[in-house]
Each structure stands twice: as structure tokens, then as C-alpha cells.
């Protein structure tokens, strides 16, 4: 290559290109891992796909409504799908479990069971979603604009996730109800009643154990390093990393400094100012 671009401009450009290129990959990986976990923990082969379909729609709605902000950071764009998938999955599980319980209670009346399930789910997820929204909204008070950017997008994403869970997902469950029943199988997770009884019976031991572990946890919290070198965290094969390395090797410098001087200074004054730096 004839030329290289170093400094923050090159680093920021490489971070943006890397994040946008890898975003589809880790979104697919997250979806596959979520699907595998749901297949292991749910008692129907169809429900995991319904959950991911509903959450996928909520993510698309959230991404689409970002146009109201005019623009968002590429970092927010890269993180939103994964975060929304993680924080809103529980709402779908609440709805399905409530629906299954009410279906038994109302002797197979699916519409009535789903109506009560929606009501029960709304009550259950209200406090959970409100605290989640408040947590993301707190980011808006950061001076760093990225905090407001990420906070607003994710708070909106949680709201949309709740709305989809209470509107679109019930329709999907009712639509595929027969398929859900036909693919129902024995739960692959072993019964934990025995462990639950032991924990309840031996709660003083559990409490003491966690109090003992609190000390090492507090020590660890105060004794790990935080790195601030963004460029050093990037793959060394990126153009900006290659440029910075060549800058250091050929010119014995790895950072650029800009000196601002008053207009009209004489050469002597400039030399004296340089010596004082």
C-alpha cells in the first residue's frame, strides 16, 4: 500500500466497519444459542420458534422506529438486537406458562384461557419491564451522548417487546396451538423438587455460604484492571493497527500531538515555547 491512515479517524472507521460486518454473525449465533436452550428447557418443539419469531418482530419494529431519532450510533445499532433478545425473552415464557395453566383451568377454552393469560402476564411483566426501562433510561443522564442514544433505543425496545408479547405473540400461540400440543414431549430438565426442598430446609447454611463468598467477591471487584486502549483491543490485521505500528517503527512515535500557538508569534517565541513543552 502507498498510504496508511493512523490515529482516531482510522481506528473509529475500522471499529464501525468491523461492528457492521460482524453484527449479522453474532445475531445469528445468539438466535441459535437461544433456540438450543429453549429446545432443552421447553416441553414443546414448536414454542422456541414461536418465541424467536415474536421477539424477532419486536426487534425489527424497534429498529424501524429508530427513524424518529433521525440518527443513532453504530455502537447502539450493533448492540440493540442482542440486548433486546436477552431482556425480553422472559415475557414470552410468562405468557405461555400462564396460557397453559388457564387452559387446564377453563377446560380447554383457548380464547378464554389466552384472555386471562394476557391479563396475568401484563400484571407479571409490568414491574419487571418498568425497572428494566428505568435502568436503560438512567443511561440518558450520561454526559456522553452514547448513553442517551443507547438508553432511549433500548427503553423503546423493551416497551415494544411488552406490546408484542401481549398482542402478536398470543395470536401466534393460538394459531399454532395444535402444533404445540402435537410436539409436546417430556421435559428434558430433571425435576428439582428435591434440591428445592433442601435449599428451603437448609437456608441458614445457604445464607452463610453466600456471606462467606461476599468477601472474595468484594476483593475481586476492587482488584481487576480496566483497559482504555481501544486500538489495542482491535485485531492487529486492521488497517489502523498496521498504520499505528508502522508509525511507531519508522518514526518512533505512536500518537499524534497538535500544538496550537498564537498567530503572529516570531520564530524566537515559537522556539522558546517549544522548549518549555
Show the residue positions of the predicted features.
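Membrane-embedded transmembrane helical bundles of large multi-pass transporters/channels
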Residues: 2-228
Amino acid at each position: 500500500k502507498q498510504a496508511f491512515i493512523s490515529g482516531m479517524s482510522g481506528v473509529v472507521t475500522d471499529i464501525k466497519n468491523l461492528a457492521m460486518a460482524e453484527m449479522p454473525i453474532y445475531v445469528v449465533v445468539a438466535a441459535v444459542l437461544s433456540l438450543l436452550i429453549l429446545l432443552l428447557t421447553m416441553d414443546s418443539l414448536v414454542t422456541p420458534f414461536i418465541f424467536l419469531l415474536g421477539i424477532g418482530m419486536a426487534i425489527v419494529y424497534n429498529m424501524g422506529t429508530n427513524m424518529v431519532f433521525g440518527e443513532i450510533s453504530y455502537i447502539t445499532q450493533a448492540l440493540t438486537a442482542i440486548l433486546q433478545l436477552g431482556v425480553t425473552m422472559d415475557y414470552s415464557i410468562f405468557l405461555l406458562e400462564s396460557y397453559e395453566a388457564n387452559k387446564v383451568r377453563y377446560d380447554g377454552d383457548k380464547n378464554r384461557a389466552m384472555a386471562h393469560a394476557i391479563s396475568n402476564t401484563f400484571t407479571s411483566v409490568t414491574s419487571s419491564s418498568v425497572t428494566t426501562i428505568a435502568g436503560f433510561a438512567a443511561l440518558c443522564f450520561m454526559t456522553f451522548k452514547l448513553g442517551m442514544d443507547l438508553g432511549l433505543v433500548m427503553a423503546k425496545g423493551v416497551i415494544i417487546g411488552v406490546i408484542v408479547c401481549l398482542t402478536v405473540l398470543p395470536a401466534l400461540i393460538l394459531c399454532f396451538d395444535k402444533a404445540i400440543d402435537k410436539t409436546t414431549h417430556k421435559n428434558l430438565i430433571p425435576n428439582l423438587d428435591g434440591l428445592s426442598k433442601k435449599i428451603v430446609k437448609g437456608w441458614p447454611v445457604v445464607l452463610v455460604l453466600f456471606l462467606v463468598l461476599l468477601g472474595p467477591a468484594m476483593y475481586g471487584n476492587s482488584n481487576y484492571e480496566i483497559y482504555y486502549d481501544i486500538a489495542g483491543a482491535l485485531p492487529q490485521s486492521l488497517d489502523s493497527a498496521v498504520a499505528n505500528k508502522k508509525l511507531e517503527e519508522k518514526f518512533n512515535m505512536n500518537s499524534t500531538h497538535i500544538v496550537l500557538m498564537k498567530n503572529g508569534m516570531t520564530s524566537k517565541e515559537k522556539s522558546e515555547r517549544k522548549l518549555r513543552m
